[in-house]
Amino acid sequence: MNRIDGREFNELRPIKITRNFNKFAEGSVLIEMGNTKVICTASIEDKVPPFQKGTGKGWITSEYGMLPRATETRNPREVTKGRPSGRTMEIQRLIGRSLRSVVDLDVLGEKTIWIDCDVIQADGGTRTASITGSFIALADALNKLVEKGDIPKIPLKGFVAAVSVGIVEGNELLDLSFQEDSNALVDMNVVMTDKGEIVEIQGTGEGGPFTKQNLTDLLSLAEYGIEQIIKIQKEVLSDIVDKIGVDSVENNNSNPQSSQN
């Protein structure tokens, strides 16, 4: 199958991540995956939701939205409709769950980190790009807490990223564009850690059922893509990468690599 943009079946779209995109947020990025572009910010609050009060644990939560003209035709802001759509709620929860899976909330303490993802241009994979970009914004925000002396170490147990896979015209493809996604027999979003652990799988037989072998093949394809994405995350976070996934405070105090940003 010849893909629209000439990619191989297992080839990611070009990825560009601009760190510190917003000067006010404790962590921020602009992530570009092909023609999909998302601004992700991480903001720290010195309080937690009521269900976390008194536990000593922090919380990571997310909001997600799209610029009205992020798509080919204008879509009104959801605030004008009075409530977020079911899709928006689903994506917000997915982003929050994905990030919490690699955060030690005990080390964070009773703080909330708000992850805000705003899609400024959508060409497929907005939720997966949001997760991948938000992880970097979150890491920078957590590092600022360490630098201020508020927490002893970056409470990240590892890296997390996401990618879409699917079956289009009988072909298993990695990182679907909007047009590919629209024509997919099977559409799947996969979230994984740098250890190859699965955080979440969202898979649907849009055009019909699929087999266990299809599922296995798509997961392998997603794992291959996520490994590449996490390598990019580590390059972007080169100045603090040695502080991520560290068990002891002593090891966390080792000299970081020099920044490339």
Curated annotation (Swiss-Prot):
One Pfam family from the record: RNase_PH
Enzyme class: transferase
Highest taxon of the lineage: Bacteria
Key words, A-Z: Nucleotidyltransferase, RNA-binding, rRNA processing, Transferase, tRNA processing, tRNA-binding
Disulfide bonds: none
Catalysed reaction, written as an equation: tRNA(n+1) + phosphate = tRNA(n) + a ribonucleoside 5'-diphosphate
Coiled-coil annotated residue ranges, if any: none
EC code(s) of this entry: 2.7.7.56
GO BP annotations listed: rRNA catabolic process; rRNA processing; tRNA processing
The keyword Nucleotidyltransferase is annotated on this UniProt entry: yes
UniProt binding sites for phosphate: R87, G125, T126, R127
GO molecular function, one term: tRNA binding
Matching PANTHER family: EXOSOME COMPLEX COMPONENT, EXOSOME COMPLEX COMPONENT RRP41
Subunit structure: Homohexameric ring arranged as a trimer of dimers.
Biological role stated in the UniProt entry: Phosphorolytic 3'-5' exoribonuclease that plays an important role in tRNA 3'-end maturation. Removes nucleotide residues following the 3'-CCA terminus of tRNAs; can also add nucleotides to the ends of RNA molecules by using nucleoside diphosphates as substrates, but this may not be physiologically important. Probably plays a role in initiation of 16S rRNA degradation (leading to ribosome degradation) during starvation.
Family, as annotated: Belongs to the RNase PH family.
Name the UniProt record assigns to this protein: Ribonuclease PH
Organism whose genome encodes this protein: Thermoanaerobacter pseudethanolicus (strain ATCC 33223 / 39E) (Clostridium thermohydrosulfuricum)
